[in-house]
UniProtKB/Swiss-Prot annotation:
Protein name in UniProt: DNA polymerase catalytic subunit
GO molecular function: DNA binding; DNA-directed DNA polymerase activity; nucleotide binding; RNA-DNA hybrid ribonuclease activity
Protein's organism: Human herpesvirus 1 (strain SC16) (HHV-1)
Any Gene Ontology biological process: viral DNA genome replication
Principal place of residence: host cell
Cellular component annotations (GO), alphabetically ordered: host cell nucleus
Family, similarity comment: Belongs to the DNA polymerase type-B family.
Extent of Acidic residues compositional bias: 662-675
Bias type Basic and acidic residues, positions: 650-661, 676-691
EC number: 2.7.7.7, 3.1.26.4
Length: 1235
């Protein structure tokens, strides 16, 4: 440890001293534009020259914060490569010791203490208080009347812990002995940060009075309070020893359980509780036999719902409350947050300010970190738990969210760093701020400076790329595990706050994390991009090219150690790379404006933005239903064990399941796992997935009439099918009955719907008997959405964007209602409602089919309904037939009618069907008309819409797993089929005959152009000069490799090869590129070694990859006795490797000249073509492949390595002749030569 006096230094101290002396050596020319003119650093720390005494802590009142405002000793970890004067053998690894001095930062030749607050700071600061000292300018006393809220916090305060003199009596009463306080965080129109502490909010739950009185012998509400207090005092531990009946308040109210029509109103105890912990304990443990209602509702939700009009994101106004009471400003020394102004008030002091819609000047921070392994292997992927694996740079861009202006560019660098002049000039040319480079001796000082910026500047919104799964977890693990820094004071709260990242859990599909920071909303653009657009790769560079038409200067992870060790100039290259990543993410943020849509959802659902981002769809519907239920006199039961399956047995709750999770739909998952032994698909019915148990049969479809249809096909869509079914048939928990006697007094058909679902009769009363709560919600939401959309055309561009995000948010919540009822372990499940919706949907498809076939079977019948059809007659016989029905779409094949006429008449046809068959608001709409349609299978088709646009759905040629070559070739084939009339005619003739007939006869001549594309593709695949990049396939790493059931996957093979070669391994959710190579001796040896590596990694704990020194040697096998079938010499024939074992990293294949497996790629091309075009041959894939192969000449193509050996021996390639006679002469000459 470094001594505070002049004593000798320990080995750790000498290491740090060498790091410091090397770091502070005179530097070369500095980059321009980074503050004061370059100069030698003065007064730097060097333990050999000047001992440093311990800093004296300021005296004064007890500190009310837990962030670092002073520090005089810290753990010093720095890479030895910063010792630039040391010999090379001394520059490996890291210095690790303890240092007694204040943390330092250097910028442009100046030196400052990281934690010192004063004029001339190196980064912007917005906080008024720091370390208990008020730094506001003289006379600072802003008046706050109106403020915007973006986040809401809740905590419990105790009266004995507060200074009574600083609080009005009404606030002290609200927290005596304890009480929940809601804190609204926001900004005033002038840009002052404000925190409003709202006292008096109480959580509560319900219990049936009759059951409570019978079980507990209660005669009055006070008796119940005494029983609860006694139960808490007897609970294990000392948490509730001081609880008395005064902690509770109980009253008797009349409410109705929301489940089932026959449930009658009853008396309930409503129990008010002063703390969420007490509420949770009571609902889980107090009299388990008595059902609890709404015990899981948090204090923030209660605050929003119990005060009509209050929102989680919007403008508020302070006003006089009851008895003309006013909000009380807090003295700065009593602040609990890093705001400029704080108030105490009660809910009656608040009102919504409805006349304002613009956002105030919130700040957005966009950041990115660069890391480097610091152990013996610097190419290993860094692990936050390893002290030697370091964060070396952090880029930090600060934006004004309202103007989108980039205000500051900061680069935190471990070691000196000179940004390239070209980069500085580029930023200046774009009108962007000059970066401020902040340099540090050690990792702790850099991380502390970054967190100090976060605290002092306090951005309301934070973004980055994959920051939830990597950047934040890495930083927080470093700070808490390595440096033992408490983080509870680094959000908006000064202490006892939340600054935490945790895993939601590793679901079947992906590993996801979530972050919660008081007063800071983290929006990861990686998640936004993967939700919004479909790409073959979600690397930032690929996304930037696709979305921004921009690209970054990429820097390989393998190059970072060398660049970092090369000195300030090369570290500047890393800094440029780090800054440009943040710049691209900032552009993506303002391209998609995710905060607008998320805030609109949060406002509608009554939850804060963080819950909107991380807590799934369930909570959004639940809070809205909770609000409406209260207005209608209903209460919602706590659901654990509440809803029983068909067998009458309550399903057990999975340990890892969360009520608010839903299984994400991940395109490409099936294809990534179906190769070589992928898992079987479960049948329809009950299906258990991570956090989601669907206990009913899903929507069905009308089987497609596969083939190539060259007559017009009209597609009708049901508008908002499932929401409209719920509305039309009044479906709800509260309108459902499972008993016939419950509706016996009502008239069937008129007063209730009777329907059989899954072999059971269900009854739903009509709206005039009892209106469905779900229907009311949907009706109000859709009316709101319609009103918002009507305002968009008359709005300014800025307001139009906001309104569009609001209407999109409403649509998202509406579409969540059906799924909300169908999750068995959800917040409020009702599988009968979900199953009824899908049953009615299928009946609607069948009814539509029967009506169309009967009503418009003859052209005269069509004319009777639509006289204008006379002008749209086309040559040929007339018919109208439904060829496919898919959940909410119906495909109608119309022969003898023009596509133009059907397009014009489609809406009238849809309205006619809607009026004849369906209850409003269910309605059909004409979505499109195909002029040609290749209908392959369910959810798989390709068609050309009237007007020329091609639509492709569910077909392999557009899947992101295929390589570029196969995608291009498949697309060329499809374009020929649809846009070449000769090919289209031949294909239509092909599809009209049974596929077996074509095995014995030539294919139509019109397919020659089609065959020419296949011949050319075959030539390109076998061309030795081909571009390997055209043959790169990709697959998503959806979870850690050890979590895969099927290990025989190509992208997993490449993952382990990269690990063995010390290359950067992909992160979860990355797409891994690979090529399939030819089987050679070298490949076989690598596969054998890789098997050992997989076993080693499987034994590694947690998610940490095993770090072997090299590819392990294959296990020795016992010598086998040659069999009679073995070749001479006794050597056994090598086994044929699986395709997944032949996968290789494209960069490695190019660098080492590894030959591709041409047979695989042509088979893959034929496979993709067969899946697409098998509809031409009766969906018989085997016959399709056989017929497509007719176009390819039978030529033997030796492997590339064999070809090379033959050429080296003087042999040349001879192709087939143009005619059979020419080929015969060539073969004759060859045999004569060999003879």
């Amino acid at each position: 440890m470094f001594s505070g006096g002049g004593g000798p230094l320990s080995p750790g101290g000498k290491s740090a001293a060498r790091a410091a002396s090397g770091f502070f050596a005179p530097a070369g020319p500095r980059g321009a534009g980074r503050g004061p003119p370059p100069c030698l650093r003065q007064n730097f720390y060097n333990p050999y020259l000047a001992p440093v005494g311990t800093q004296q802590k300021p005296t004064g009142p007890t500190q009310r914060h837990t962030y670092y405002s002073e520090c005089d000793e810290f753990r010093f970890i720095a890479p030895r490569v910063l010792d630039e004067d040391a010999p090379p053998e001394k520059r490996a690894g890291v210095h690790d010791g303890h240092l007694k001095r204040a943390p330092k930062v250097y910028c442009g030749g100046d030196e400052r203490d990281v934690l010192r607050v004063g004029s001339g700071g190196f980064w912007p600061r917005r906080s008024r208080l720091w370390g208990g000292v008020d730094h506001a300018p003289a006379g600072f006393n802003p008046t706050v009347t109106v403020f915007h809220v973006y986040d809401i916090l809740e905590n419990v305060e105790h009266a004995y812990g507060m200074r009574a003199a600083q609080f009005h009596a009404r606030f002290m009463d609200a927290i005596t002995p304890t009480g929940t306080v809601i804190t609204l965080l926001g900004l005033t129109p002038e840009g002052h940060r404000v925190a409003v502490h709202v006292y008096g909010t109480r959580q509560y739950f319900y219990m049936n009075k009759e059951e409570v009185d019978r079980h507990l012998q209660c005669r009055a509400p006070r008796d119940l309070c005494e029983r609860m207090a006694a139960a808490l005092r007897e609970s294990p531990g000392a948490s509730f020893r001081g609880i008395s009946a005064d902690h509770f308040e109980a009253e008797v109210v009349e409410r109705t359980d929301v489940y089932y029509y026959e449930t009658r109103p009853a008396l309930f105890y409503r129990v008010y509780v002063r703390s969420g912990r007490v509420l949770s304990y009571l609902c889980d443990n107090f009299c388990p036999a008595i059902k609890k209602y709404e015990g899981g509702v948090d204090a923030t939700t209660r605050f929003i719902l119990d005060n009509p009009g209050f929102v989680t994101f919007g403008w508020y106004r302070l006003k006089p409350g009851r008895n003309n009471t006013l909000a009380q400003p807090r003295a700065p020394m009593a602040f609990g947050t890093s705001s400029d102004v704080e108030f105490n008030c009660t809910a009656d002091n608040l009102a919504i300010e409805g006349g304002m819609s613009d956002l105030p000047a919130y700040k957005l921070m966009c950041f990115d970190i660069e890391c480097k392994a610091g152990g013996e292997d610097e190419l290993a992927f860094p692990v936050a738990g390893h002290p030697e694996d370091l964060v070396i740079q952090i880029s930090c861009l600060l934006y004004d969210l309202s103007t989108t202006a980039l205000e500051h560019v900061l680069l935190f660098s471990l070691g000196s760093c000179d940004l390239p002049e070209s980069h500085l000039n580029e930023l200046a040319a774009r009108g962007l701020p000059t970066p401020v480079v902040l340099e540090f001796d050690s990792e702790f000082e850099m991380l502390l400076a970054f967190m100090t910026l976060v605290k002092q500047y306090g951005p309301e919104f934070v973004t980055g790329y994959n920051i939830i799964n990597f950047d934040w977890p890495f930083l927080l693990a470093k700070l808490t595990d390595i440096y033992k820094v408490p983080l509870d004071g680094y959000g908006r709260m000064n202490g006892r706050g939340v600054f935490r990242v945790w895993d939601i859990g590793q679901s079947h599909f992906q590993k996801r994390s979530k972050i919660k920071v008081n007063g800071m909303v983290s929006i990861d653009m990686y998640g936004i991009i993967t939700d919004k657009i479909k790409l073959s790769s979600y690397k930032l560079n690929a996304v930037a090219e696709a979305v921004l038409k921009d690209k970054k200067k990429d820097l390989s992870y393998r190059d970072i150690p060398a660049y970092y060790a090369a000195g300030p100039a090369q570290r500047g290259v890393i800094g440029e790379y780090c800054i440009q990543d943040s710049l691209l993410v900032g552009q993506l943020f303002f391209k998609f404006l995710p905060h607008l849509e998320l805030s609109a959802v949060a406002r509608l659902a009554g939850i804060n933005i963080t819950r909107t981002i991380y807590d799934g769809q369930q909570i959004r519907v639940f809070t809205c239903l909770l609000r409406l239920a209260d207005q209608k006199g209903f209460i919602l039961p706590d659901t654990q064990g509440r809803f029983r399956g068909a067998g009458g047995e309550a399903p057990k709750r999975p340990a890892a399941a969360r009520e608010d999770e839903e299984r994400p739909e991940e395109e490409g998952e099936d294809e990534d796992e179906r190769e070589e032994g992928g898992g079987e698909r479960e049948p329809d019915g009950a299906r258990e997935t991570a956090g989601r148990h669907v206990g009913y049969q899903g929507a069905r479809v009308l089987d497609p009439t596969s083939g190539f249809h060259v007559n017009p096909v009209v597609v009708f869509d049901f508008a908002s099918l499932y929401p409209s079914i719920i509305q039309a048939h009044n479906l709800c928990f509260s309108t459902l009955s499972l008993r016939a006697d419950a509706v016996a007094h009502l008239e069937a058909g008129k007063d209730y719907l009777e329907i059989e679902v899954g072999g059971r009769r269900l009854f739903f009363v009509k709206a005039h008997v009892r209106e469905s709560l779900l229907s009311i919600l949907l009706r109000d939401w859709l009316a709101m959405r319609k009103q918002i959309r009507s305002r968009i055309p008359q709005s300014s561009p800025e307001e139009a964007v906001l309104l569009d995000k609001q209407q999109a948010a409403i649509k998202v919540v509406c579409n969540s209602v059906y799924g909300f009822t169908g999750v068995q372990h959800g917040l409020l499940p009702c599988l009968h409602v979900a199953a009824t919706v899908t049953t009615i949907g299928r009946e609607m498809l069948l009814a539509t089919r029967e009506y169309v076939h009967a009503r418009w079977a003859a052209f005269e019948q069509l004319l009777a309904d639509f006289p204008e059809a006379a002008d749209m007659r086309a040559p040929g016989p007339y018919s109208m037939r439904i060829i496919y029905g898919d959940t909410d779409s119906i495909f109608v094949l119309c022969r003898g009618l023009t596509a133009a006429g059907l397009t014009a008449m489609g809406d009238k046809m849809a309205s006619h069907i809607s009026r004849a068959l369906f209850l409003p608001p269910i309605k059909l709409e004409c979505e499109k008309t195909f002029t040609k349609l290749l209908l392959i299978a369910k959810k798989k088709y390709i068609g050309v819409i009237y007007g020329g646009k091609m639509l492709i759905k569910g077909v392999d040629l557009v899947r992101k797993n295929n390589c570029a070559f196969i995608n291009r070739t498949s697309r060329a084939l499809v374009d020929l089929l649809f846009y070449d009339d000769t090919v289209s005619g031949a294909a239509a003739a092909l599809a009209e005959r049974p596929a077996e007939e074509w095995l014995a006869r030539p294919l139509p001549e019109g397919l020659q152009a089609f065959g020419a594309v296949l011949v050319d593709a075959h030539r390109r695949i076998t061309d030795p000069e081909r571009d390997i990049q055209d043959f790169v396939l990709t697959a998503e790493l959806s979870r850690h490799p050890r979590a895969y059931t099927n290990k025989r996957l190509a992208h997993l093979t490449v993952y382990y090869k990269l690990m063995a070669r010390r290359a950067q391994v992909p992160s979860i959710k990355d797409r891994i590129p690979y090529v399939i190579v030819a089987q050679t001796r070298e490949v076989e040896e690598t596969v054998a070694r890789l098997a050992a590596l997989r076993e080693l990694d499987a034994a590694a704990p947690g998610d940490e990859p095993a770090p072997p020194a090299a590819l392990p040697s294959p296990a020795k096998r016992p010598r086998e006795t040659p069999s009679p079938a073995d070749p001479p010499g006794g050597a056994s024939k090598p086994r044929k490797l699986l395709v997944s074992e032949l996968a290789e990293d494209p960069a490695y294949a190019i660098a080492h000249g590894v030959a591709l497996n041409t047979d695989y790629y042509f088979s893959h091309l034929l496979g993709a073509a067969c899946v697409t075009f098998k509809a031409l041959f009766g969906n018989n894939a085997k016959i399709t492949e056989s017929l497509l192969k007719r176009f390819i000449p039978e030529v033997w193509h030796p492997p590339d390595d064999v070809t090379a050996r033959l050429r080296a021996a003087g042999f040349g390639a001879v192709g087939a002749g143009a005619t059979a006679e020419e080929t015969r002469r060539m073969l004759h000459r060859a045999f004569d030569t060999l003879a």
